[in-house]
Swiss-Prot record:
Cofactor: Mg(2+)
Coiled coil: none
Compartments where found: Virion
Name of this chain's protein: RNA-directed RNA polymerase
Domain RdRp catalytic: 501-687
Lineage: Viruses, Riboviria, Orthornavirae, Duplornaviricota, Resentoviricetes
Annotated source species: Rotavirus A (isolate RVA/Human/United States/WI61/1983/G9P1A[8])
Length: 1088
């Protein structure tokens, strides 16, 4: 098993290195004889350690346990209380501590001053501007680095160079921290005033970022980039990331395309050997030079030099360095500003009368027409979703904050909560629920705010609107989104596509006579100038739609939606500033509405169309594509002559002038070869992604536990690695060791082993091999999985109490009654379960469940309870299949060119052999006929788990299920009697299995699973028609082959002779697979 357990035991002896420290390994086995020996071994170890005897002789005596059983966990005692970190740190603090430049940032508190200078007293103090928001501490991070350094101090050759580079960088960090002392965190991993008052305010978050960067250093270039960012980010907490990453928007326009991938008619990527010259007017070079000069002004030396050197020949080979700099710049950490500054940022824009009214008018009309186009069909057909919009809204109501804390009574229990779902229940119980009245957000009821922090940008504010806004918007927005789903212009929503498709779309139309215009419109979206035309466009669209229907319910839905827009035109926000809460009139559009994403996309599309229609007055061209993707829009324009420098310059200046006529402060660029938007950038005909996910600092604190955060950390590490930013894996594993340990008492800790953390159970945190998801099939693996399943679901007294209260029951019954035409236990129970699950975001419930889980886990990690579960997991299925496969060596040549240069070699190799995929595999069941049938008549959306359960019921029961959801009896019986139903069984099973196997996550999402090259490595003689069995056999074979290729860089072929007698058994088993939710799966989901 290896590496993790080895690091674990070494780490424990590194951290607990005093005389009194003891580490006792705990083993388990599925073999009952060996299990007895494991228990004896453990008992004797505990006994000896109590007497203070050495455990060496026991290790000899129980060699059979150590060799044949599986390590479950390590129990560690240490009576030595801390300051161990400080002692070790001194040895590394040999350099000169950094001194912060206290004039580096415009806003006073963004300067890295001593905390007591920024906050005079503990009452004034807030950690919100520097809170790492992660459940691990600076001292742990320091320990992890020092552990790595100690472990590698004797490395030779190239490894020694890496050691020296990291040691040098760590000396800077250690010396600076040592000067002030290591800040101690409290039990919530926060840094209080008492600890911070005599230390620089940003010390902790800076140190975390620096550690993350230095542990990602491999080459000399990495070292130079990291050194510069570490030193400068100590002072510059505001603009560093922006300065360093700005040039990229121009760099992408400088590289000739020599061969690229384009999307063909079948929406696949195919290679095209076209050559396109980068045509760059001098003006663009001047702008780039200005950016580089700004970097130098800010004290950067090496990074601007690297860019300058690259500019000499602008080669694609050396562009990886540019791409690296771009990714690294985000790892300086989040820019966290005070709410007041974030809000006033939007309000600083001066209103000018000198704007082009005609353009604004055109913009508004385009928004109006798009809204009408999106909603015309559902409105004319009196779509049931628009009629029952309120119910649909309630069913998908989130448990996020409603903006104010209220005292609520559930049965005999009185609680305080801000959660929307609880407020709705309470209001319904007390007759205060009036979804037909949208509360104003004017000066009398200003909007409370949330925040969004991103590296390299200013803090943005988020409206926390009353739940009535959500209910009013939900159904209409869902319809808008389903329109966007089949409209190519909306890159973000386009059906099942992924970013590779959008990439091929751009490169497809690039040629010597076309140019691409790309604009970052994030400033415009949140500007005051946008508000009136934007809201008015929506309102006008809704008015037109209201005239297209006679159904009072649909009209009511549209009117409520319109009311939300009217109210928001006159919006005030409340901002805490010190001890006072300021009310400010806020004239701009902010996130927080249900419509945010959809409406912004519509507005951005309208904006670029407005601009293009003006450009068309002056030039003659064909618009080949227009796309909007979040805050960015881009268009490819084809002219009737070859593009020249002068043309690029003219178009560029005209576009900028047109935007300025609308007072839009946006960054608009024109290029012939590449684009750069927030989500991805295309350079030299290849696609790149920014690997900018912070590992040791988080944006905000949620209610995830240390285990969840360990899984998220690993998941972030994987995403970065796929995008070309690699952090040392040993360091990541050390962090996982720290974050998954469980304290029993002050001096007793339990550290789970690799087997516990990598088996896919409810506790899975990471994969033992990066990019490869293994499903254990050995006896010990299945044994531990079963053991964990026995304690997966935890009860919460508070949740039970709330759920048994009249308030809760009435609410669930109200939903069921409105939704169902006749009794349907599955759905009613489903609603109750969903509503009860929403209570999890209420902290006391969460903590209670967590405590129960920890104590169960503690018992388990000391001795697993053998447990005969009747549940079947995906592991059981694969375990049944495995013995019938025979492996032989095979050969698969590299046949595709690289299009994503940042991929790790092993993943790149697999793609080059079998090809990539440009679509998401459907894993939600939404493509099945039963799902479409339900959505035709009901607002209820069953999950893939529920569909999987329902489709395997008896036909009579399926029919009742459908009828109760409002499907006409004749349709229901036709469905059950038709061939469609048996196709559905297969489709849903397929989706469910894909979902279980995380086929759309990690690096699996990049591989073409239907590649003929892959198929020809698999031979399965065809016996009997059970498509589901054939499917699972093939899928298993594909995963085996791909995993082997990732691991070994070589190919195998598989032959399977599956006995017919076993097929029917397997098929029955496949209808009882239990889904396992773990921190690992939720971290994957979190990436989405």
């Amino acid at each position: 098993m290896g590496k993790y357990n080895l690091i674990l035991s070494e780490y424990l002896s590194f951290v607990y290195n005093s005389q009194s420290a003891v580490q006792i390994p705990i083993y388990y086995s599925s073999n009952s004889e060996l299990e007895k020996r494991c228990i004896e071994f453990h008992a004797k170890c505990v006994d000896s350690s109590k007497k203070g005897l050495s455990l060496k002789s026991l290790f000899e005596e129980y060699k059979d346990v150590i060799d044949n059983a599986t390590l479950l966990s390590i129990l560690s005692y240490s009576y030595d209380k801390y300051n161990a970190v400080e002692r070790k740190l001194v040895n590394y603090a040999k350099g000169k501590p950094l001194e912060a430049d206290l004039t580096a940032n415009e806003i006073d508190y963004e300067n890295n001053k001593i905390t007591s200078e920024l906050f005079q007293s503990a009452e004034e103090y807030t950690d919100s501007l520097m809170d790492p928001a992660i459940l691990t501490s600076l001292s742990s991070n320091l320990n992890a680095v020092m552990f790595w350094l100690e472990r590698h101090s004797n490395d030779v050759a190239d490894a020694n160079k890496i050691y020296k580079r990291r040691l040098d960088l760590f000396t800077i960090v250690a010396s600076t921290i040592n000067k002030y002392g290591v800040p101690r965190h409290n039990e919530k991993y926060r840094y209080e005033y008492e600890v911070m008052k005599d230390k620089p305010y940003y010390l902790v978050t800076w140190a975390n970022s620096s550690i993350e960067m230095l542990m990602s250093v491999f080459s000399h270039e990495d070292y130079l980039i990291a050194k510069e960012l570490i030193i400068l980010s100590y002072s510059n907490r505001s603009t560093l990331a922006k300065l360093v990453s700005s040039p990229m928007s121009i760099l992408v326009a400088l590289i000739d395309i020599n061969g690229t991938f384009i999307t063909n008619e079948e929406l696949e990527l195919e290679f095209s050997d076209k050559y396109i010259k980068a045509i760059v007017p001098d003006q663009i070079f001047d702008e780039l030079q200005e950016m580089i000069d700004n970097m130098r002004k800010a004290g950067l030396v090496d990074i601007p030099r690297m860019i300058q050197e690259w500019l000499v020949d602008c080669s694609l080979e050396k562009f990886t360095l540019m791409s690296k700099i771009y990714s690294w710049s985000f790892h300086v950490g989040f820019r966290k500003q005070k709410m007041i500054d974030a809000a006033l940022d939007q309000l600083k824009t001066e209103y000018t009368e000198d704007v082009d009214g005609e353009m604004y008018n055109e913009y508004t009309m385009l928004i109006r027409d798009e809204i009408v186009k999106m909603l015309e069909v559902p409105v004319k057909h009196d779509d049931h979703l628009l009629r029952d919009s309120e119910l649909a809204g309630l069913l998908s109501m989130s448990s996020a904050s409603n903006g104010e804390s209220r005292q609520l009574k559930f049965g005999r229990k009185t609680i305080f909560s801000t959660k929307k779902n609880m407020h709705v229940m309470d209001d319904i119980a007390h007759g205060r629920y009036t979804p037909g009245v949208i509360p104003p957000v004017n000066v009398d009821r200003p909007i409370p705010l949330g925040r969004r922090d991103v590296p390299g940008r200013r803090t943005r504010i988020i409206f926390i609107l009353p739940y009535e806004y959500f209910i009013a918007q939900h159904a209409v927005v869902e319809k808008m989104l389903s329109y966007a789903k089949h409209t190519r212009e909306y890159a973000e929503f386009y059906s099942q596509s992924n970013q590779l498709l959008s990439y091929g779309d751009v490169t497809r139309f690039l040629s010597s006579n076309s140019m691409v215009l790309y604009t970052d419109v994030s400033q415009w979206d949140s500007s005051q100038h946008n508000t009136q035309p934007f809201r008015k466009g929506i309102i006008m669209g809704l008015d037109m739609l209201s005239n297209m229907t006679n159904d009072p319910k649909v009209v009511q839905t549209l009117n409520l939606y319109k009311q939300t827009q009217i109210n928001l035109m006159d919006s005030y926000v409340q901002i805490p500033d010190g001890n006072v809460i300021k009310k400010i009139q806020y004239g701009a559009v902010a996130s927080g509405e249900k419509q945010t994403k959809a409406a912004n996309s519509i507005a951005n599309l309208a904006l670029i169309k407005t601009v293009l229609s003006r450009i068309a007055n002056k030039y003659s061209f064909i618009t080949k594509i227009i796309r909007v993707d979040g805050d960015d829009n881009y268009a490819v324009l084809q002219f009737n002559t070859d593009v020249t420098k002068q043309m690029v310059q003219d178009v560029s200046n005209d576009v900028r002038y047109i935007y300025s006529r609308m007072n839009a402060k946006v960054k608009a660029l024109v290029s012939t070869v590449g684009i750069e938007i927030a989500k991805r950038y295309i350079a030299g005909g290849k696609i790149f992604f920014r690997a900018g996910i912070n590992l040791l600092n988080n944006e905000k604190r949620g209610q995830s536990t240390q285990w969840d955060q360990a899984a998220i950390l690993y998941s972030n590490y994987i995403v970065n690695k796929l995008r070309g930013f690699e952090t040392d894996r040993e360091f990541i594993l050390t962090k996982i060791i720290q974050m998954t340990s469980v304290a029993i008492t002050g001096s007793l800790r339990l550290f789970p082993s690799e087997r516990v953390l990598t088996t896919n159970s409810t506790f899975k945190v990471f994969d033992s091999e990066d990019f490869i998801i293994e499903y254990g099939t050995t006896n010990d693996e299945v044994y531990i999985q079963r053991a964990f399943m026995s304690l997966s679901s935890q009860k919460s007294g508070i949740a039970d109490e709330i759920a048994s209260s009249q308030t809760f029951k009435n609410y669930v019954n109200k939903l069921s009654d409105q939704l169902l035409i006749s009794k349907n236990v599955i759905v009613s129970k489903g609603i109750a379960v969903t509503e009860k699950a929403k209570l999890n975001s209420y902290a006391p419930v969460y903590l209670e469940k967590r405590r129960a889980q920890i104590s169960a886990l503690l018992t388990m990690l000391q001795k697993p309870v053998s447990f005969k579960s009747n549940k079947i997991t995906i592991n059981d299925i694969l375990r049944d299949i495995k013995p019938f496969f025979v492996t032989s060596e095979a050969n698969l040549p590299i046949q595709y060119r690289k299009f994503m240069p940042t991929l790790p070699n092993n993943v790149q190799y697999v793609i080059q052999c079998i090809g990539s995929r440009t679509y998401q595999i459907e894993d939600s069941g939404s493509k099945s006929s039963i799902s479409k049938l339900i959505s035709k008549y009901s607002v209820y959306k069953p999950s893939i788990e529920e569909l999987y359960k329902v489709i395997s019921l008896r036909e009579q029961e399926i029919q009742l299920y459908l009828v109760s959801l409002g499907v006409p009896p004749v349709d229901a019986s036709t469905y059950v009697g038709s061939r469609i139903y048996s196709q559905d069984k297969y489709k849903i099973l397929e989706s469910y299995v894909y979902n279980l196997l995380s086929i759309n996550y990690g690096c699996y999402q990049l591989f073409d699973f239907n590649s003929p090259d892959l198929e020809k490595l698999i031979r399965i003689p065809f016996k009997g028609k059970i498509p589901a069995v054939t499917f699972i056999l093939h899928l298993y074979a594909k995963l085996e082959i791909i995993n082997y290729a990732i691991k070994n860089g070589a190919w195998i072929s598989l032959f399977c002779n599956y006995p017919k007698s076993e097929m029917i058994k397997l098929w029955k088993k496949m209808w009882n697979i239990t889904a396992l939710r773990s921190p690992y799966t939720s971290a994957n989901f979190f990436q989405d």
